[in-house]
Amino acid sequence: MTNLRKTHPLMKIINSSFIDLPAPSNISSWWNFGSLLGVCLVVQILTGLFLAMHYTSDTMTAFSSVTHICRDVNYGWLIRYLHANGASMFFICLFLHIGRGLYYGSYMFLETWNIGVLLLFAVMATAFMGYVLPWGQMSFWGATVITNLLSAIPYIGSDLVEWIWGGFSVDKATLTRFFAFHFILPFIIAALAGVHLLFLHETGSNNPSGLCSDADKIPFHPYYTIKDILGVLLLILVLTSLVLFSPDLLGDPDNYTPANPLNTPPHIKPEWYFLFAYAILRSIPNKLGGVLALVLSILVLAVVPFLHTSKQRSMMFRPFSQCLFWILVADLLTLTWIGGQPVEHPFIIIGQLASILYFLLILVLMPLASLFENNLLKW
């Protein structure tokens, strides 16, 4: 009798995706982040579901409902901090996953890469709306500042902002719709992740060498299932350590003050994972220019496959491209630091230089380095 997992309509999909999937024999731990992102998404959906059972999306009671969750609900504090810090872990895994894709040339799988960029936008939108829900000072002012950016769009801008707000300012209608969107988007993300995986399995995984690995494939189970479980255990270890020892390490103290439209915090800044984009936004003195730069800072990823000029796929054997890649990483860390600083003399110019360098590296320097390396090989 044939195995049920190979014949059952549902089981055979799971089988061909996670059990009998032919995988390259040399993929490193950098390939673990896809499964870690899946785990993060499941954790976020589950903790979010339990939080939604006790949360009220009303301006009068939102802040106190979060307090109620932390004080009165059984393990409510744990669920709340798992959700908040789970978002940080999600973004750490996302950035490492994207970095891996850039380094090893995984962006050459066009459909998979473009759905990935779409996923990044969806996750960023979800995280932004989630940050508004506790209705603290930074929630309110973050929502006001970021939604206000849409007013920079010519002709329809101001109408668009009022349409999103559901009034003339960030208020009850805004909070209610943000909660609705924050609840539905993770399920859309899960569906997109399924499509992401579908396209990946059309081609098979890339590997560190960037060469075709069809001649040397191994089954996903048990080799990579056990490897993924190790990654998941490490992720859980880091997340629980963060939640149980310093749950507010990555948060903003201002968000423990209830939202007050009459009192602006001295420094309005988003969560740490948006700081790099926020720094790029602030580095351009023009409002529309800043908004365009903000969108392009993420959208530039979609252009990367078309700027691949190298004869080799991976950066494994390309020292000049490697050097530029690590400069890009350092530049992003610099932008993250600048995004959290006040708009004062040394920080303004550093932010502007780092923003210019960011676009210059991706759009100009890395493609040129690839051409140079091609010539070194005398091809």
From Swiss-Prot:
Compartments it resides in: Mitochondrion inner membrane
UniProt-annotated binding residues for heme b b566: 97, 196
Q: Name one GO biological process term.
A: mitochondrial electron transport, ubiquinol to cytochrome c
Q: What does the record say about how the cofactor binds? A: Binds 2 heme b groups non-covalently.
Q: Where are the transmembrane segments?
A: 33-53, 77-98, 113-133, 178-198, 226-246, 288-308, 320-340, 347-367
A single GO cellular-component term from the record reads:
respiratory chain complex III
Subunit and partners: The cytochrome bc1 complex contains 11 subunits: 3 respiratory subunits (MT-CYB, CYC1 and UQCRFS1), 2 core proteins (UQCRC1 and UQCRC2) and 6 low-molecular weight proteins (UQCRH/QCR6, UQCRB/QCR7, UQCRQ/QCR8, UQCR10/QCR9, UQCR11/QCR10 and a cleavage product of UQCRFS1). This cytochrome bc1 complex then forms a dimer.
The similarity annotation says:
Belongs to the cytochrome b family.
Note in the entry? Heme 1 (or BL or b562) is low-potential and absorbs at about 562 nm, and heme 2 (or BH or b566) is high-potential and absorbs at about 566 nm.
PANTHER family (alphabetical): CYTOCHROME B (PTHR19271:SF16)
Q: What is this protein called?
A: Cytochrome b
The scientific name of the source species is Sorex hoyi (American pygmy shrew)
